[in-house]
């Protein structure tokens, strides 16, 4: 959107605060239904960020896929679970929690080391040369398709693996 500077800045601050409050709500609400609604708020704020940055296709995809499908699926799954499963009978820290936290910490450290070791200067020059090629393309949809099949192939596949693991986890939880 082409908005005047103060209005654009106000919307950025408003959406950022909504994003932060929604994220805190996802983590801190004791009721999982409220957490799922907070996740919906976070996803809507992210799609509005895309609208502010003139990425209308990505914003529409964000709303349709994440808010319209995945968040509703999460709400249904939470509502079908028995309420007694959320009691305070569980121990605070188990062996599985320790292993999971170690895996998450090691992934975080490897991500930070990869970010610090990457030569960002070379990536900027590669991006500038790709922009010349992209000017000949007809539409934004073609540009998105080319980026998904070339530059973002690995993240796209990793997201599909993460969604597959989440689906398998949901099936395991539903069988118990």
UniProtKB/Swiss-Prot annotation:
Q: Per its record, what are the GO molecular function terms?
A: NADH dehydrogenase (ubiquinone) activity; quinone binding
Q: Where in the cell is it found?
A: Plastid, Chloroplast thylakoid membrane
Q: Where are the transmembrane segments?
A: 10-30, 32-52, 61-81, 105-125, 153-173
What EC number(s) does its UniProt record assign?
7.1.1.-
Q: Name one GO cellular component term.
A: chloroplast thylakoid membrane
InterPro entries membership: NAD(P)H-Q_Oxidoreduct_6, NADH_UbQ/plastoQ_OxRdtase_su6, Nuo/plastoQ_OxRdtase_6_NuoJ
| Class of the enzyme per the UniProt entry, highest EC level | translocase
Catalysis: reaction(s): a plastoquinone + NADH + (n+1) H(+)(in) = a plastoquinol + NAD(+) + n H(+)(out); a plastoquinone + NADPH + (n+1) H(+)(in) = a plastoquinol + NADP(+) + n H(+)(out)
* Alphabetical UniProt keywords: Chloroplast, Membrane, NAD, NADP, Plastid, Plastoquinone, Quinone, Thylakoid, Translocase, Transmembrane, Transmembrane helix, Transport
Its chief place of residence is plastid
- Cite the Pfam families for this sequence: Oxidored_q3 (PF00499)
- Please tell me whether the keyword Iron is annotated for this protein: no
Reply yes or no: does the keyword Thylakoid apply: yes
Q: How does it sit in the membrane?
A: Multi-pass membrane protein
- Domain of life per record: Eukaryota
UniProt subunit comment: NDH is composed of at least 16 different subunits, 5 of which are encoded in the nucleus.
Family according to the record? Belongs to the complex I subunit 6 family.
This chain's function reads: NDH shuttles electrons from NAD(P)H:plastoquinone, via FMN and iron-sulfur (Fe-S) centers, to quinones in the photosynthetic chain and possibly in a chloroplast respiratory chain. The immediate electron acceptor for the enzyme in this species is believed to be plastoquinone. Couples the redox reaction to proton translocation, and thus conserves the redox energy in a proton gradient.
This one is known as: NAD(P)H-quinone oxidoreductase subunit 6, chloroplastic
What organism is the protein native to?
Ipomoea purpurea
